[in-house]
A protein has these predicted regions:
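Hydrophobic hinge/microswitch elements
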Residues: 1-4, 11, 72-127, 186-192
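Alpha-helix C-terminal capping/helix-to-coil transition sites in glycosyltransferase folds
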Residues: 2-4, 27, 63
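A late-sequence structural motif
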Residues: 127-180
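Beta-alpha-beta core module
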Residues: 17-23, 28, 53-56, 100-147
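Secondary-structure junction motif
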Residues: 34, 42-86, 150-153, 164-177
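Active-site-adjacent beta-strand anchor residues
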Residues: 68-69, 95, 142
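Short beta-strand elements of ligand-binding domains
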Residues: 7-13, 35, 69-70
Length: 193
């Protein structure tokens, strides 16, 4: 319908979302990021590429200021619960749904934050830790179920899947997915399903 959202770039903790088709194109770990010079920092240059990050117990953060995800983010309430269980809720000094802002605040020494791995740049000098168990979040495109896509929306799907962290095989999957989706919508419209 006119004025309704039909498609969105969407981070999520799960891929089965009511009323949506979710086209997942990337998994990434949610990492604890510490500012430069934090007492729990380590020499990040010694971390080997492709190897797991060190693991930290959040309770070790003590009185470290925490930058939290806003509740409207896909993982905001879960992150708040994790901080709460570690006794760190009183340390939360700021919340935002703008992840690059949280990263910049860590970079500028304001506090620690849980941020998706794709934002991390080792050259920035901040330290990252995994949690145990690891927390995986998904990046993808949410489409309103049964809604026929415009050419512009199809183009955006191709653009995102070909350029935003997707493994190479996902580049070809975009064509297949869109073709199969059209067949499902056509079959539904003609009561074949």
């Amino acid at each position: 319908s006119e004025g309704e959202i039909t498609m969105s770039l969407l981070g999520a903790m799960e891929t089965s979302l009511p009323g949506l088709e979710y086209l997942k194109f990337m998994d990434e770990e949610l990492l604890l990021m510490l500012p430069k010079g934090h007492p729990l920092s380590y020499d990040y240059t010694k971390c080997l590429p492709g190897r797991p990050y060190p693991v930290m117990d959040l309770a070790d953060l003590g009185d470290t200021p925490i930058l939290g995800s806003a509740p409207e983010t896909s993982y905001g309430n879960m992150v708040l619960s994790i901080y709460r269980n570690a006794g760190l809720e009183p340390n939360i000094i700021f919340r935002s749904n703008v992840v690059p802002l949280l990263y910049e605040m860590v970079l500028n020494g304001v506090g620690a934050a849980m941020i998706p791995d794709s934002y991390y740049n080792p050259d920035d000098g901040i330290c990252v830790y995994s949690l145990s168990p690891r927390i995986i979040v998904y990046q993808g495109i949410g489409l309103r179920s049964g809604y026929p896509l415009s050419e512009a929306e199809e183009y955006l799907i191709h653009l995102v899947m070909n350029n935003w962290g997707s493994p190479y095989y996902m580049h070809q999957y975009a064509d297949y997915y869109l073709e199969q989706r059209k067949l499902r919508i056509d079959a539904y419209e003609y009561n074949q399903i």
